C-alpha cells in the first residue's frame, strides 16, 4: 500500500510540474505578442498559435518594392542622353584639334601659295593678301614680314613661313585674319615700332646695295610715318625737290629720331647737333619756305 501511494504521488507531481512549465511558457509567449485568441474553442482548450517566421519578419521590415522593368521611353531617353554627350565630346575634341597649331597644316597652307616652289613669290603673295583681306601696300604686311623675318620684299621662303607662323600660332587663313589686329597693335608700342622701322630699311633695299633708292625710301617712309608725323608731307616734298637719289641707313634711322624729338616749328632743332646733313638741309629748306 505504501509503495502504491508513493507511485501515485510521483505521477501527480510530474503532471503538476509539466502544467507549471506549460503555463510559464504561455505567459512568456504572451509577453512577446506571439499568441492570439483564435476563437472561443481555442481559448477554452488552452491551445496556442505562434506566428510564422514570415509574419514576424513583416512586422519588423517594410515590404520590398518590386523593380519595374525599364520602359521603351526610358531606354530611348537614356540613349538620347548618351548620344548628346558623345556629340558634345566629339565637338569639343574636333574644336580642340582645330585650335591647336599643326606644322603639317601650316606646310599645306604654304604650298597653296608657293605651288611647287620653295617660296611664295609675287603671284602667290597677291593671292595671299586677297585671302586675308589686306592690300599688299598695307603696313600690316610689313609687320607680318617682320614677324616672319622675311629677307626679301615680295617673298616668303618656306623656312621664314614655318618659323614665323609657328611663333604666331597660325596655320590657316582664318587664324591669320584673327591675328591681324594684334599685328597692327605692335605699331603702337614704341620699342616694337623702332624695330619694325629699322627692319624696313633692310627689307626694302636691293641686297647688292647698301642704301635705299629714293623712290622706295619715300614709299616706306610714307607707310611708316605718313599718318603719325605731321611734318611728313613737307619732308616728302623736300625729298621730291632734293638732289638725293638714295638714303643710307644712318639717314634713315635719324629721320625717325627727328620725327619723335623735334617740335613742329623746329625751334628745338640744334644745327650743331649730330644730325646728318640731309636733315640740316631739310630744316633750312623748311624755314626758308615758311618765310617766303
Curated annotation (Swiss-Prot):
Pfam family, one: Cullin_binding
Protein's name according to its UniProt entry: DCN1-like protein 4
Tissue note: Highest levels of expression are in the testis. Very low levels of expression in other tissues such as the heart, brain, kidney, liver, lung and ovary.
Species of origin: Mus musculus
Positions of crosslink type Glycyl lysine isopeptide (Lys-Gly) (interchain with G-Cter in SUMO2): 95
Domain of life: Eukaryota
Keyword list, A-Z: Isopeptide bond, Nucleus, Ubl conjugation
Start-end of Low complexity biased regions: 47-58
Amino acid at each position: 500500500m505504501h509503495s502504491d501511494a508513493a507511485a501515485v504521488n510521483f505521477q501527480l507531481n510530474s503532471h503538476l510540474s509539466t502544467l507549471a512549465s506549460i503555463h510559464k511558457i504561455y505567459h512568456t509567449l504572451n509577453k512577446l505578442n506571439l499568441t492570439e485568441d483564435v476563437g472561443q474553442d481555442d481559448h477554452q482548450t488552452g491551445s496556442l498559435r505562434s506566428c510564422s517566421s514570415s509574419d514576424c519578419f513583416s512586422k519588423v521590415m517594410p515590404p520590398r518594392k518590386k523593380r519595374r522593368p525599364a520602359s521603351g521611353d526610358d531606354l530611348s531617353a537614356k540613349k538620347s542622353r548618351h548620344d548628346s554627350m558623345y556629340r558634345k565630346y566629339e565637338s569639343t575634341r574636333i574644336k580642340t584639334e582645330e585650335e591647336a597649331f599643326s606644322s603639317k597644316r601650316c606646310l599645306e597652307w604654304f604650298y597653296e601659295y608657293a605651288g611647287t616652289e620653295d617660296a611664295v613669290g609675287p603671284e602667290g603673295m597677291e593671292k595671299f593678301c586677297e585671302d586675308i583681306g589686306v592690300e599688299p601696300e598695307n603696313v600690316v604686311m610689313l609687320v607680318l614680314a617682320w614677324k616672319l623675318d622675311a629677307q626679301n620684299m615680295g617673298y616668303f621662303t618656306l623656312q621664314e613661313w614655318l618659323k614665323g607662323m609657328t611663333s604666331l600660332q597660325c596655320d590657316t587663313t582664318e587664324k591669320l585674319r584673327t591675328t591681324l589686329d594684334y599685328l597692327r597693335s605692335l605699331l603702337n608700342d614704341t620699342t616694337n615700332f623702332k624695330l619694325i622701322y629699322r627692319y624696313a630699311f633692310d627689307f626694302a633695299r636691293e641686297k647688292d646695295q647698301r642704301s635705299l633708292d629714293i623712290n622706295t625710301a619715300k614709299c616706306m617712309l610714307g607707310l611708316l610715318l605718313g599718318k603719325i608725323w605731321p611734318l611728313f608731307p613737307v619732308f616728302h616734298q623736300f625729298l621730291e625737290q632734293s638732289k638725293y637719289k638714295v638714303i643710307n641707313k644712318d639717314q634713315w634711322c635719324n629721320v625717325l629720331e627727328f620725327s619723335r624729338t623735334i617740335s613742329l616749328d623746329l625751334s628745338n632743332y640744334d644745327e650743331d647737333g649730330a644730325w646728318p646733313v640731309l636733315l640740316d638741309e631739310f630744316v633750312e629748306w623748311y624755314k626758308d619756305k615758311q618765310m617766303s
